[in-house]
């Protein structure tokens, strides 16, 4: 009878409702499992690419935020270690404590870095000078490049300093920690903006400021104790600090390359065992995961180059390459500078190309290499004297082709070399570029495995040698052979045959 209640019908209803509820729970579980990061917990090295979120990579935008919050940056508390002897004793006790308490000392991370609290005329005043004059696009270098964009691509001093002095709660790097007592430090960071002062100050006031900075730095007890060997000095543009840097040649220089021709650095001033190569700040935007998936199948230009076609010193190879390649099918060679229009043209060209030409300029390096990497365009490096950033960590053979200058200018050789490249090899290198891009993007906050992080991982390998030379200099007696004769300076000549496979 309709509507009549029976125990059997009630049990069927309960069973039906149970099955529906169970199905909903099972569906929800499977959905959550499918989106869980644990489901595809592949090792990070197998990930095809990465994406930046809530990170600022623009120097201008990051600087505006930095200066707007300048009062929140914690200054270095005064460390009253004005007596070199007392500082040396304090360092000894600190190092002995670490030796017996840390089984990995002195190779362990994080590195302990003391950041000097220099007078504002060496730091904040120069940053404000850049910000207040940035809109003046008429300020050009002798070759027509906008000065402020040139400063931007050498702004490694800003990115490192901004991260070091940020509140610890805002920092993401575990490779370095800031200490506020000099005797606790492995290294000392000198936050003087040498490139901004060189390009934005008149010649004589700039030289005067360099002399003041030199005196301030070399008067520090920690500098006198080590002769500057454990001090980090950012001189990323080859002209910066040039008039006085012979007096600080023992310090660790942060450089764009190591020109061995003598045009930029004097013999004995720079070498790999002492100094560190840092990448330029890219001039173009990152081609992220979505961009790469859209552009890689459509890269129909074989080889692309946009830049100055005539350069001095090692860059003379450019004019020879123009003669060889300019009319070739599938090749785009354009004259251009790094202005806003130039940035857009270079970015579009690189994202349409499989290979990007990266020849030497006035110096062995240029920002173009890093523009190509973040654009997903395989660099073709023709710069026989080039030294590369973080090469103790990164294997550039996986993302770039190295061609000797002699081979590159042989009629037809370079085009045949590129056209004979197997599609599978090209695809593999493009995938590797997607993984490597993160290592060349300066950002705020600084990211793990970004260039700021790799700086300190590379520095960790120098600490033992720095301590060796510091202690050796402290105990060498007068009249002894006080010059080290164990420098290893192997010539750096590109051998195309060794990298074809």
Q: Where are each of the predicted segments found?
A:
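Catalytic binding pocket for nucleotide-activated donors in carbohydrate/polymer assembly enzymes
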Residues: 345-441
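Juxtamembrane luminal stem/stalk of type II transmembrane Golgi/ER carbohydrate-processing enzymes
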Residues: 2-340, 346, 351, 431-434, ...
């Amino acid at each position: 009878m309709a509507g009549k209640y029976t125990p059997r019908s009630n049990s069927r209803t309960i069973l039906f409702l149970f099955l529906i509820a169970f199905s909903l729970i099972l569906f929800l579980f499977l959905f959550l499992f499918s989106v869980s990061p644990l489901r595809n917990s592949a090792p990070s090295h197998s990930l095809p690419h990465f994406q930046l979120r809530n990170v600022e990579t623009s120097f201008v935008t990051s600087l505006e935020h930095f200066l707007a919050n300048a009062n929140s940056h914690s200054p270095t508390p005064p460390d009253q270690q004005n007596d070199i002897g007392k500082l040396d004793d304090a360092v000894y006790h600190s190092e002995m404590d670490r030796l017996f308490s840390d089984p990995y000392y002195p190779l362990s991370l994080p590195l302990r870095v003391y950041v000097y609290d220099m007078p504002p005329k060496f730091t904040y005043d120069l940053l404000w000078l850049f910000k207040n004059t940035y809109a003046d696009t008429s300020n050009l270098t002798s070759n027509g490049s906008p000065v402020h964009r040139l400063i931007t691509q050498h702004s490694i001093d800003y990115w490192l300093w901004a991260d070091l002095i940020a509140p610890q709660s805002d920092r993401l790097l575990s490779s370095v920690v800031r200490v506020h007592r000099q005797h606790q430090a492995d290294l000392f960071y000198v936050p003087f903006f040498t490139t901004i002062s060189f390009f934005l100050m008149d010649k004589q006031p700039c030289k005067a400021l360099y002399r003041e900075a030199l005196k301030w730095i070399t008067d520090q007890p920690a500098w006198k104790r080590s002769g500057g060997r454990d001090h980090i000095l950012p001189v990323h543009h080859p002209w910066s600090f040039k008039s006085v840097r012979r007096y600080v040649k023992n310090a660790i220089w942060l450089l764009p390359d190591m020109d061995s021709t003598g045009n930029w650095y004097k013999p004995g001033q720079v070498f790999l065992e002492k100094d560190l190569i840092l990448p330029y700040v890219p001039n173009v935007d990152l081609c992220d995961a979505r961009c790469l998936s859209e552009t890689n199948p459509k890269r129909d230009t074989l080889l692309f180059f946009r830049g100055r076609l005539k350069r001095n010193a090692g860059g003379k190879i450019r004019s020879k390459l123009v003669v060889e390649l300019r009319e070739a099918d599938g090749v785009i060679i354009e004259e251009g500078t790094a202005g806003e229009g130039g940035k857009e043209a270079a970015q579009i060209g690189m994202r349409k190309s499989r290979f990007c030409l990266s020849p030497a300029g006035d110096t062995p390096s240029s920002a173009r290499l890093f523009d190509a990497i973040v654009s997903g365009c395989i660099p073709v490096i023709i710069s026989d004297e080039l030294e590369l950033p973080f090469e103790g960590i990164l294997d550039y053979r996986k993302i770039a082709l190295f061609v000797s200058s002699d081979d590159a200018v042989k009629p037809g050789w370079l085009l045949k070399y590129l056209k004979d490249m197997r599609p599978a090899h090209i695809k593999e290198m493009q995938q590797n570029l997607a993984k490597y891009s993160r290592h060349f993007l300066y950002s705020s906050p600084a990211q793990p495995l970004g260039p700021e992080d790799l700086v300190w991982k590379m520095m960790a390998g120098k600490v033992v040698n720095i301590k060796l030379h510091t202690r050796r200099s402290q105990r060498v007696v007068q009249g002894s052979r006080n010059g080290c004769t164990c420098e290893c300076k192997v010539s750096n000549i590109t051998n195309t045959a060794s990298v074809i496979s």
